[in-house]
Protein backbone atom coordinates (compact mmCIF):
# COMPACT_ATOMS: atom_id res chain seq x y z
CA UNK A 1 0.00 0.00 0.00
CA UNK A 2 2.76 2.45 0.90
CA UNK A 3 4.55 1.68 -2.39
CA UNK A 4 1.37 2.33 -4.37
CA UNK A 5 0.77 5.62 -2.54
CA UNK A 6 4.36 6.76 -3.16
CA UNK A 7 3.89 5.85 -6.83
CA UNK A 8 0.61 7.74 -7.11
CA UNK A 9 2.27 10.84 -5.66
CA UNK A 10 5.26 10.49 -7.99
CA UNK A 11 7.77 9.64 -5.27
CA UNK A 12 8.43 6.17 -6.66
CA UNK A 13 8.15 4.49 -10.04
CA UNK A 14 5.58 1.72 -10.12
CA UNK A 15 5.99 -1.43 -12.17
CA UNK A 16 2.64 -1.41 -13.93
CA UNK A 17 3.05 -4.23 -16.42
CA UNK A 18 0.89 -6.32 -14.07
CA UNK A 19 -2.19 -5.28 -12.11
CA UNK A 20 -1.48 -4.00 -8.60
CA UNK A 21 -3.27 -5.22 -5.48
CA UNK A 22 -3.04 -3.86 -1.94
CA UNK A 23 -3.68 -6.16 1.01
CA UNK A 24 -5.22 -4.44 4.01
CA UNK A 25 -6.86 -5.76 7.15
CA UNK A 26 -9.12 -3.65 9.34
CA UNK A 27 -9.47 -3.46 13.12
CA UNK A 28 -6.26 -5.24 14.16
CA UNK A 29 -7.52 -8.68 15.03
CA UNK A 30 -4.78 -11.10 16.10
CA UNK A 31 -5.70 -13.25 13.06
CA UNK A 32 -3.84 -10.68 10.96
CA UNK A 33 -0.57 -11.84 12.49
CA UNK A 34 -0.96 -15.29 13.98
CA UNK A 35 -2.76 -18.58 13.58
CA UNK A 36 -5.46 -19.03 16.22
CA UNK A 37 -8.24 -21.40 17.18
CA UNK A 38 -11.64 -19.87 16.50
CA UNK A 39 -14.71 -21.36 18.24
CA UNK A 40 -16.74 -23.56 15.92
CA UNK A 41 -14.16 -23.38 13.11
CA UNK A 42 -10.98 -24.76 14.66
CA UNK A 43 -7.54 -23.55 13.72
CA UNK A 44 -7.56 -20.54 11.41
CA UNK A 45 -4.32 -19.73 9.61
CA UNK A 46 -3.31 -16.11 10.16
CA UNK A 47 -2.93 -13.76 7.20
CA UNK A 48 0.80 -13.35 7.82
CA UNK A 49 1.29 -17.12 7.84
CA UNK A 50 -0.64 -17.36 4.55
CA UNK A 51 1.71 -14.81 2.98
CA UNK A 52 4.78 -16.57 4.41
CA UNK A 53 3.56 -19.92 3.06
CA UNK A 54 3.03 -18.35 -0.36
CA UNK A 55 6.57 -16.94 -0.42
CA UNK A 56 8.00 -20.27 0.79
CA UNK A 57 6.12 -22.23 -1.88
CA UNK A 58 6.48 -19.87 -4.85
CA UNK A 59 9.48 -17.70 -3.98
CA UNK A 60 9.65 -13.94 -3.47
CA UNK A 61 9.86 -13.31 -7.23
CA UNK A 62 6.40 -14.83 -7.77
CA UNK A 63 4.89 -11.83 -6.00
CA UNK A 64 7.57 -9.19 -5.51
CA UNK A 65 6.52 -6.61 -2.99
CA UNK A 66 4.03 -8.90 -1.23
CA UNK A 67 3.08 -6.94 1.84
CA UNK A 68 0.00 -6.23 3.96
CA UNK A 69 -1.10 -3.32 6.11
CA UNK A 70 -3.05 -4.02 9.29
CA UNK A 71 -5.14 -0.99 10.25
CA UNK A 72 -5.54 -1.30 14.02
CA UNK A 73 -7.90 0.20 16.58
CA UNK A 74 -5.74 1.83 19.25
CA UNK A 75 -7.94 2.00 22.36
CA UNK A 76 -7.47 -1.14 24.50
CA UNK A 77 -10.94 -0.72 26.01
CA UNK A 78 -12.61 -0.56 22.59
CA UNK A 79 -10.66 -3.61 21.38
CA UNK A 80 -11.65 -5.56 24.50
CA UNK A 81 -15.31 -4.69 23.99
CA UNK A 82 -15.25 -5.63 20.29
CA UNK A 83 -13.46 -8.87 21.18
CA UNK A 84 -16.10 -9.66 23.80
CA UNK A 85 -19.07 -8.88 21.56
CA UNK A 86 -17.81 -10.18 18.20
CA UNK A 87 -15.00 -12.68 18.84
CA UNK A 88 -16.22 -14.82 21.74
CA UNK A 89 -14.07 -12.95 24.30
CA UNK A 90 -10.95 -14.95 23.44
CA UNK A 91 -8.53 -12.02 23.62
CA UNK A 92 -8.16 -11.86 19.84
CA UNK A 93 -7.85 -8.05 19.70
CA UNK A 94 -4.58 -7.56 21.59
CA UNK A 95 -1.68 -5.28 20.73
CA UNK A 96 1.08 -7.65 21.87
CA UNK A 97 1.95 -8.50 18.24
CA UNK A 98 2.06 -4.99 16.76
CA UNK A 99 5.77 -4.34 17.35
CA UNK A 100 6.79 -7.70 15.90
CA UNK A 101 4.47 -7.16 12.92
CA UNK A 102 5.90 -3.70 12.30
CA UNK A 103 9.39 -5.24 12.22
CA UNK A 104 8.32 -8.01 9.82
CA UNK A 105 9.13 -7.46 6.12
CA UNK A 106 5.65 -8.59 5.05
CA UNK A 107 3.52 -6.37 7.30
CA UNK A 108 2.98 -2.81 8.49
CA UNK A 109 0.79 -1.47 11.29
CA UNK A 110 -1.35 1.58 10.47
CA UNK A 111 -4.06 3.70 12.09
CA UNK A 112 -7.75 2.72 12.08
CA UNK A 113 -8.75 5.29 14.73
CA UNK A 114 -8.75 5.52 18.50
CA UNK A 115 -11.92 3.52 19.14
CA UNK A 116 -13.64 3.16 15.74
CA UNK A 117 -16.32 5.48 17.17
CA UNK A 118 -17.93 2.09 17.60
CA UNK A 119 -21.66 2.06 18.39
CA UNK A 120 -21.16 -0.68 21.00
CA UNK A 121 -19.07 1.59 23.20
CA UNK A 122 -21.52 2.67 25.84
CA UNK A 123 -19.69 5.78 26.93
CA UNK A 124 -19.10 8.21 24.11
CA UNK A 125 -18.01 11.11 26.23
CA UNK A 126 -18.91 14.33 24.46
CA UNK A 127 -19.16 12.63 21.04
CA UNK A 128 -22.01 10.93 19.21
CA UNK A 129 -21.43 7.20 18.61
CA UNK A 130 -22.34 5.03 15.69
CA UNK A 131 -20.15 5.72 12.69
CA UNK A 132 -17.42 7.93 11.37
CA UNK A 133 -19.56 10.41 9.47
CA UNK A 134 -20.38 12.00 12.84
CA UNK A 135 -16.71 12.85 13.49
CA UNK A 136 -17.11 16.54 12.62
CA UNK A 137 -14.96 18.67 14.93
CA UNK A 138 -11.24 19.28 15.15
CA UNK A 139 -11.18 17.90 18.70
CA UNK A 140 -12.99 14.69 17.77
CA UNK A 141 -10.80 14.18 14.69
CA UNK A 142 -7.68 14.82 16.75
CA UNK A 143 -8.77 12.27 19.35
CA UNK A 144 -9.59 9.64 16.72
CA UNK A 145 -6.51 10.21 14.54
CA UNK A 146 -3.64 11.73 16.52
CA UNK A 147 -4.28 10.07 19.90
CA UNK A 148 -4.49 6.74 18.08
CA UNK A 149 -1.31 7.39 16.10
CA UNK A 150 0.61 8.32 19.24
CA UNK A 151 -0.60 5.18 21.03
CA UNK A 152 0.43 3.05 18.04
CA UNK A 153 3.84 4.75 17.91
CA UNK A 154 4.36 3.99 21.61
CA UNK A 155 3.63 0.31 20.89
CA UNK A 156 5.56 -0.09 17.62
CA UNK A 157 8.22 2.59 17.65
CA UNK A 158 6.91 4.05 14.37
CA UNK A 159 4.32 6.78 13.82
CA UNK A 160 1.74 5.36 11.38
CA UNK A 161 1.55 7.39 8.18
CA UNK A 162 -1.67 5.84 6.94
CA UNK A 163 -5.23 6.08 8.22
CA UNK A 164 -8.25 3.99 7.16
CA UNK A 165 -11.72 5.29 7.93
CA UNK A 166 -13.73 2.94 10.17
CA UNK A 167 -16.70 1.43 8.36
CA UNK A 168 -15.29 3.11 5.21
CA UNK A 169 -17.19 6.21 6.36
CA UNK A 170 -16.01 9.77 6.75
CA UNK A 171 -17.51 13.17 7.35
CA UNK A 172 -16.97 16.00 4.91
CA UNK A 173 -15.14 17.78 7.75
CA UNK A 174 -12.48 15.10 8.29
CA UNK A 175 -11.98 14.63 4.52
CA UNK A 176 -12.11 18.21 3.31
CA UNK A 177 -10.87 20.23 6.29
CA UNK A 178 -9.11 18.19 8.98
CA UNK A 179 -6.81 15.97 6.91
CA UNK A 180 -5.86 18.62 4.32
CA UNK A 181 -4.79 20.93 7.16
CA UNK A 182 -2.57 18.18 8.61
CA UNK A 183 -0.47 17.90 5.44
CA UNK A 184 2.98 19.43 5.58
List the model feature ranges, each with a label.
Residues 1, 159-160, 169-184:
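His/Asp/Glu-enriched short active-site or ligand-binding loop at hydrolase and phosphoryl-transfer sites
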Residues 1-106, 159, 165:
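Active-site beta->alpha N-cap acidic-glycine motif
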Residues 30, 52, 56, 146, ...:
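Sec-exported extracytoplasmic/periplasmic mature domains
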Residues 31, 116-118, 167-172:
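Active-site environment of divalent metal-dependent phosphoester hydrolases
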Residues 34, 80-83, 121-122, 172-178:
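A short acidic (Asp/Glu
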Residues 36, 93, 99-104, 114-156:
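Alpha-helical scaffold elements lining the catalytic groove of polysaccharide deacetylases
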Residues 37-44, 127-132, 175-184:
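Charged, glycine/proline-rich intrinsically disordered loops and linkers
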